[in-house]
Amino acid sequence: MSSSTAVPGQSPIAETAPLSLCAREPHVPADRLVAEMVPPPRFDTVRFDTYVPDPKQPSQREAVDVLSGFAAGLGGAHASGSARRRWFARKAAAPAAPLGVYLDGGYGVGKTHLLASLWHATPAAPALKAFGTFVELTNLVGALGFQQTVKTLSGHRLLCIDEFELDDPGDTVLVSSLLSRLVEEGVALAATSNTLPGKLGEGRFAAADFLREIQGLSAHFRPLRIDGEDYRHRGLPEAPAPFTDEQVTRAAYATEGASLDDFPSLLAHLARVHPSRYGALTDDLRAVCLTEVRAVPDQATALRLVVLADRLYDREVPVLASGVPFDKLFSDEMLNGGYRKKYFRAISRLTALARDAKGLVAQ
């Protein structure tokens, strides 16, 4: 008996079925959350000298120079030592300079590359440096509790927070309190976002307590603006148009370690899995194949999809899809609302992953 199914005139589909994200319900213990607070695989090997500043954007070279000096100033017994204070003294005349740096810029200008390079360049053992997204940091607090998180991170020289965008007043108060405690313990901070610290949460919440927390949070950082075009698409061909359901299905069966799900079912499954587990959801995947991609129906669903897109991008997992193109995932209302920066980042990252997946389809 044949071990494959064939369509006349086309190559056979292997009998072994692809994986399914919808069949996965990962459990992530707290110790894994702590152990994984390192730069993701995409940024394992990045360094300051592998960042290529755009000569038309002097802010990019300035950011490399400033961050290199910041990393050098974190040597010594602890991040609260005099070396760090001297570094900030050279940069600002204020008597109480901020104890962190904040990389603000558009999509794809290399902020995460620079943040990971800072982590790698800081002269401390990996166990004394932490790197994670804002979502991962709040998940860590949820898993360990506030006091234990302070205790776990207070001995670190550096905490790097990627994608620092505050969408919830409760998270704002939580993280502001956490960072204030860590600063008191001498932990240096570095963060990236598409929004300056003083503007975090703008247009989303107007409560006085929320605004007060934002102002207190911004005082911990020295902003560094990084200008430039999205490097993920710089000089590259356009992302491929969506494929057919049949092409995506065949590619999933032909690619070892690929998953295959229809998009509506995946969105429903994401609602049942905590975002802290989305990274584990993609463990050992070589490609994600999606059929029936369509515009997301509501903001809660869209925000969950953003987190999944970030985890796939971090892990360099190609995404092959049929249906609507990724730049049509979010409505005009979403792209003009308070979460628009998240949505544009997701479009940029998914487009890059779609380009990576093009070779999975037989020509």
Language model region names:
Residues 1-91, 219, 225:
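A short, basic N-terminal segment
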Residues 101-103:
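Hydrophobic anchor at the beta1->P-loop junction of P-loop NTPases
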Residues 111:
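Conserved lysine of the Walker
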Residues 114, 118:
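Hydrophobic positions on the alpha1 helix immediately C-terminal to the Walker A/P-loop
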Residues 121-155:
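AAA+/P-loop NTPase substrate/partner-engagement loops
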Residues 142-187:
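Conserved nucleotide-sensing/catalytic segment adjacent to the nucleotide-binding pocket
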Residues 255-314:
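Conserved helicase/translocase motor-coupling segment
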Residues 288-363:
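Terminal-proximal interaction/regulatory segments of ATP-powered molecular machines
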